[in-house]
């Protein structure tokens, strides 16, 4: 019953996955077939490396700056499928202009699946090999994102499921066995990133919440914008965990 209530509540939102599903429904009901749906799931590259629901700015930045990665057992034990972005691009290119692909949906994914715990170990081993430092990890029982309005649906309705995909349909157009192997691809991309690390928006509100959990502090010399300093300080010391999280 609780799961049904969660699904009902999530349907009131415009989360990316729900929005895409609604758009697919529109296409299927259109009575036309001049479309093709691509479902790539999670992709990675030299500039994007995810851990559960965390972008690299929320885990890798912490690791490289000596603070603890905050992850959770409930997600770590689930299986996922990560595909190198270039391979997805090759898959898309393989069906462009093919009439047999009209009116069809394709999962363009790797043949492999790993648990998030295994993905984390790949990251940790690579960072240790490259920097000589093994990052600290705090494994909570439950993801803290469950407590944050707007952030929980990706956990409950995606990362809480084992994600393995049937990619046999796209194999009619491209040999997915030639896709980059997940482990070697992640290692290569992370090593490349570590040579020239560049981070996007850091999400200092979330960083403050993580530091509240771990008992750590980010030096304010890392935070260049006053607004971000205030957000970090509020979430580190004042804002209750169940509030709407500001990044």
Predicted regions and their residues:
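Substrate-positioning beta->alpha
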Residues: 51-59, 72-96, 103-104, 187
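Mid/C-terminal beta-alpha module of Rossmann-like enzyme folds, strongest
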Residues: 94-155, 199-205, 211-247
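Short, small-residue-biased leader/transition segments that mark boundaries at the very start
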Residues: 2-7, 116
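Conserved loop-to-helix N-cap of the C-terminal "lid" that shapes the substrate pocket in Rossmann-like
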Residues: 37, 79-89, 105, 116, ...
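Non-catalytic, hydrophobic alpha-helical segments
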Residues: 88, 92, 108, 119, ...
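Conserved beta-loop-beta element that borders a ligand/cofactor-binding pocket
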Residues: 24-49
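Glycine-rich Rossmann NAD(P)(H)-binding loop
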Residues: 45, 72-78, 106-113, 124, ...
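Active-site helix of classical SDR
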Residues: 19
């Amino acid at each position: 019953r609780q799961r049904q209530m969660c699904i009902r509540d999530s349907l009131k939102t415009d989360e990316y996955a729900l929005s895409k599903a609604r758009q697919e429904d529109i296409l299927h009901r259109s009575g036309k077939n001049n479309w093709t749906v691509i479902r790539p799931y999670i992709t990675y590259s030299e500039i994007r490396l995810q851990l559960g629901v965390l972008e690299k700015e929320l885990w890798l930045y912490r690791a490289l700056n000596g603070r603890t990665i905050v992850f959770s057992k409930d997600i770590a034990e689930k299986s996922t499928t990560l595909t190198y972005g270039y391979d997805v691009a090759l898959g898309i290119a393989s069906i462009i202009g093919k009439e047999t692909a009209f009116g069809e949906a394709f999962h363009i994914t790797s043949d492999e699946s790993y648990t998030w715990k295994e993905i984390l170990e790949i990251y940790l081993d690579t960072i240790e090999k490259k920097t000589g430092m093994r990052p600290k990890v705090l494994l909570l029982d439950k993801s803290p994102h469950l407590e944050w309005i707007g952030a929980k649906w990706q956990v409950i309705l995606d990362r809480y499921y084992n994600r393995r995909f049937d990619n046999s349909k796209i194999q009619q157009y491209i040999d997915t066995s030639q896709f980059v192997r997940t482990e070697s691809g992640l290692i290569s991309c992370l090593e490349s990133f570590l040579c020239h690390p560049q981070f996007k928006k850091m999400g200092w509100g979330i960083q403050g919440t993580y530091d509240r959990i771990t008992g750590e502090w980010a030096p304010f010399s890392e935070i260049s914008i006053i607004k971000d300093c205030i957000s970090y300080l509020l979430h580190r010391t004042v804002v209750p965990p169940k509030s709407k999280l500001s990044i």
